[in-house]
């Protein structure tokens, strides 16, 4: 039995997945094998030595100390695509709000309440002040064509928009899901120059911090309407407000409110609603639970943010899994120790991600703990697991 500690409210369907696999689940575990979280902040957490993995029911992992987890041999998983429909639907709503001043229009109508019978006439007289253009026939630029970006691009086509997409890391799976009518752009400046609307679906990293800034705003088609449902720090707020003031940016709709943006003209802030639907929470919880169970039971890695993805069907009597430095000679060392135990390797898999590698050996017999300790003593080996 594996012990799973929850650190946030997790959808019941996700907990049911774990319980069906005979896992003990509780928010009070003292020495868990895995953590299942949503937004719990772990940067100051002390991890117990038994902790093998962390499942994030969602996409963003800035609440998890990724480098420290890697150094301690802890796999970190997220759930890409599980909330994609939820975010896509909200973004389509935001697309219209970026065109028409719907928020301002509703507030204006509510302000007319004291006028009583005069309201219909006042509405007809003043409605042009909050009018805006159609999205049909306009061009939407999509930066990042993964699970969410590809769905947004395809949906925008159904609104009779023209769509350009930019993603230098486009995966084969995402490409298959993308309509052939989406124009693939390889120069980001072309996107800025030709699009009327812009939406981003990329991760927040040191490289993407202030991805949109004074320099990029200056390259945009005047009157650009920008949607940010990815991460707030992708946009330089000071430069954005200056671009709105000058008219270079017509409107900004974001799911990440802050003190600089709330209440500003032509800025619409949502209260981080992107993945806040019962369906998305259930999908994320179920997906994270399955990733955790597959890793704990089989050593398979799916959707890890710090280790290479590595999956191998169980083909031997026993399985050995190792997290180690990606350097020459490691596999030979492991194989020597396995052979010394008079055990044969039936199947193996070795995957790398930068400086980190992950290796699975399926063997004819179970190695003894002495062999595992020998491997743990090899410089550069972070974690050794013997699975039945």
Where are these regions (language model features)?
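Phosphate-binding beta-alpha-beta segment of Rossmann-like dinucleotide-binding domains, i.e.
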Residues: 80-139, 303-305
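Hydrophobic Val/Ile/Leu positions in short beta-strands of Rossmann-like dinucleotide-binding domains
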Residues: 4-6, 142, 322
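Glycine-rich Rossmann-fold phosphate-binding loop(s) that bind the pyrophosphate
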Residues: 145-146
């Amino acid at each position: 039995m594996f012990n799973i500690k929850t650190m946030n409210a997790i959808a019941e369907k996700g907990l049911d997945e774990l319980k069906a696999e005979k896992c003990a689940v509780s928010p009070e575990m003292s020495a868990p094998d895995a953590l299942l979280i949503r937004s719990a902040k772990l940067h100051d957490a002390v991890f117990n030595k038994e902790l093998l993995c962390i499942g994030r029911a969602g996409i963003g992992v800035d609440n998890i100390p990724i480098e420290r987890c890697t150094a301690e041999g802890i796999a970190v998983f997220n759930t890409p695509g599980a909330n994609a429909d939820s975010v896509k639907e909200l973004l389509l709503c935001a697309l219209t709000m970026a065109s028409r001043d719907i928020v301002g229009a509703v507030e204006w109508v509510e302000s007319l309440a004291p006028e009583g019978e005069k309201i219909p006439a006042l509405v007809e007289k003043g409605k042009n002040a909050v009018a805006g253009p159609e999205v049909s026939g306009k061009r939407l630029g999509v930066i990042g064509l993964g699970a969410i970006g590809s769905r947004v691009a395809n949906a925008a086509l159904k609104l009779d928009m023209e769509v350009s997409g930019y993603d230098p890391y486009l995966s084969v799976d995402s490409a298959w899901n993308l309509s052939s009518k989406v124009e693939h752009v390889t120069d980001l400046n072309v996107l800025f120059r030709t699009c009327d609307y812009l939406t981003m679906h990329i991760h927040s990293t040191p490289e993407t911090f202030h991805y949109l800034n004074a320099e990029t705003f200056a390259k945009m088609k005047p009157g650009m309407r920008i949607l940010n449902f990815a991460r707030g720090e992708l946009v330089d707020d000071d430069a954005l407000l200056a671009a709105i003031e000058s008219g270079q940016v017509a409107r900004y709709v974001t799911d990440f409110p802050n003190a600089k943006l709330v209440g500003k003209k032509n800025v619409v802030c949502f209260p981080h609603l992107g993945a806040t639907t019962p369906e998305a929470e259930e999908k994320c919880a179920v997906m994270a639970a399955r990733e955790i169970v597959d890793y704990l039971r089989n050593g398979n890695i799916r959707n890890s943010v710090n280790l290479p993805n590595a999956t191998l069907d169980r083909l031997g009597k026993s399985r050995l899994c190792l997290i180690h430095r990606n350097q020459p000679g490691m596999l030979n060392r492991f194989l020597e120790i396995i052979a010394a135990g008079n055990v044969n390797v039936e199947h193996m898999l070795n995957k790398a991600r930068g400086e980190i590698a992950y290796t699975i050996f399926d063997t004819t017999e179970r190695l003894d703990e002495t062999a595992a300790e020998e491997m743990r003593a090899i410089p550069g080996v972070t974690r050794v697991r013997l699975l039945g």
